[in-house]
Amino acid sequence: MPSYVCLIQFKDQGIRNIQDTVKRGDAAMAEAKKMGMKIVEEYWTMGAYDGVVIMEAPDDETMSAFILKVGSLGNVKGQTLRAFRRNEMEGILAKIK
């Protein structure tokens, strides 16, 4: 499955309800599983982003639907990056020879 890196920032509501952040992570894992996705790892971070989530999804459309659904809850916003594994990058590079 394609891999994604999500850079997460808390919105005001997410900060007000910070005590629930781990529970929200559990709920996100359950929702991802229902959608045929996998949250590989969650990290709460310091700096410009409050969290980094590594995910796998069957396709970009499913990933986009998940991100829109989570974002609509009002706790977080973020950026999603499509991440390429070594073998995928080798395939990409082979196309530019």
Residues covered by each model-derived region:
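Residues forming the ATP-binding cleft of Hanks-type serine/threonine protein kinase domains
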Residues: 43
